[in-house]
Amino acid sequence: YALISKKYIYIFLENPKLSKKIVSLFSKKVEILSFLELETKLKKLNIKGEKILKDIKYISKYYHDIIRKSYKKLIYEDDPILNFKAIKNNIEIRNMVKAHILDGVALTKFIYWFKNFNAVITELDIVNKIDALRSQNKNFLCKSFPTIAGSGKNGAIVHYIPNKITNRKLNKNDILLLDSGGQYKLGTTDVTRTLSIGKPEENHTVSYTQVLKSHIKLSNAIFPEGISGAYLDYLARSKLWEIGKDYAHGTGHGVGYCLNVHEGPFSISKNSNIALKEGMVFSNEPGYYIENKFGIRIENLVTIKKKILNKKDFFKIETLTLAPYDVDLITKSLLTNEELIWIKNYHNTVFKKISPYLDKNEKSWLFKEINKL
């Protein structure tokens, strides 16, 4: 916890003993205390009749009761700081664009390696490789979450994280669901690509293309002010609902700026009722899963931009993530001409932004890959 007054900042930790190096980073007005001292500090705030705002969703009953007994003027509202974080300013958006170029380079290099690797490979090999490629960048701080690398039946487990016990060798004609991301000095990334080995089965390519159509549907969304994430969730799912398919997770979540990769207060899900605003960043990640068979998910991070239509304010989606889709998994006949054009334009942007940072072989491969369609 942190308690901030006009004069001091108190940080409460389970273990308040920090190294001298960390303590030296703080101002003299920052005091490190034990969790056990939080109750005492709350009771001695001496706010003198000021009102206290509490967000009941994010406070434990224990501390709620302490504050309620100590202070009479309480207001129950949503935490306004959550909206400050959710709506990125222009500098944060510009930096996140740069972070996604760095991340896109690492992921594209990984995909090239994965597609051209001929030896036996395991899920943990994949985790180690993508983590190593990201860490080569001087702006990289750490992973934004544990890497999800599920092959075959493990891909059907939405948040599967391989370990020494579950680690699986990839077989010929498997598909891999790779969901990973990084924390950079310029922002946070989160991206999923589903990749094939060898010649994919028809069920793989058809399902992948159907998920891609949902992904594109959301990417092209245009909507007026006041619309919540529930509407965008419906837009994405509608392409799968038309063919009797669905997925048992939200279509997207808010993403922080060098903060939590899952950030509120809004989401792109069936029950989200918070109005979307310009500058919000969230994931676009529809999927399809068959238990004990395979999993498919395609994820880009996107942001909301203003668009004037008929002299009125509307919003559009701008994609931040830069990494190629697996063209080997696309059934071209299932795509409309507009969807094909969208993929082509996206891949052209990927090549323009990413290819300057690739070596000769990687660049040649990427050019051929995106032009297969």
Please report, for each region that a protein language model flagged, where it lies by residue.
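Active-site neighborhoods and metal-handling regions in enzymes and metal-associated proteins
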Residues: 1-373
